[in-house]
Amino acid sequence: GTKYKVVYEPNMEDYLLCHAAFVLPAAFACYKTDGDLKKLRGDTAYLNRMIDANIEGYRAIRNAGHTILPKADENFESAAYRRICLRFFKLMCATSLGKLCASDHAMNAVDEMSGLNRDMKAFFDANGADYPVWRALEREAGRYLQ
């Protein structure tokens, strides 16, 4: 045994919305760099824009009446949340963690990520959300997203 404890999440709809809001900005980064996140090493401005896009997504989800999950992300507009995310994204871009956590999946699941992005944008639009940073990162992803 790994002693890893599986935790059941009864509110799967909200969890999946939040997961998409966190994962898609990372996928955009993968597409911007053709799967080589190390190209973003040291590009703190871009990494902060990834966090901004994530926050836009979380804000839209919360404002539509959904719960932000996991609970640890509830204070997503705090400086502490930004610091944690920035550390994580820097680690992803400086080590093989980015390949394991994001780019391998994103680069082999372009159709899935494109569909997920379309669904998230439809959700944002249906709920009157503003998401300019998300749209900018999406444009920078280039030819990958359909």
What are these regions (language model features)?
Residues I51, I55-Q146:
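NAD(P)-dependent Rossmann-like dehydrogenase/reductase catalytic/cofactor-binding core
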